[in-house]
Amino acid sequence: MRWSVVLHLVLAVVAVGAGVHSAVFAWRSPDAARTRRLAGWALAASLAAYVVGALIYPAYKVEIRVAWLEQAHPEATRAFDLKEQFVALALPMQLALWWLLRARAARPALARGLALATAALLVTAALLAAGVETVHGHP
């Protein structure tokens, strides 16, 4: 399970980094191609992290969450669930942003708003994940 957790982490870091950079470029640069490319990387990394996370979730639920996290640190369990909800909100927004930029629609304000909201959700999810990780770690 350890390699898949590391892969999940690396993909999440790429997703957050690309998401934040796409938001920065959406606000500061008229270069839609770069923003579109970064938004595509963020979407691809988020989807890959989601798939890897879904594959490791059953083991996490049995070995960590039910085994002791829910009893010892219920606040960490709630933070994990909140992180998952933020990611679930960010994914369709990332897809919409990528599609909007890909279609080259003349809606820069919408693209900027989507990029910023998506980046905020991804960063918040990453901070929640880091908080949960400090509570339980991995054996």
Language-model features, listed with the residues they occupy:
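Polytopic transmembrane helical bundles with strong interfacial aromatic enrichment
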Residues: 1-139
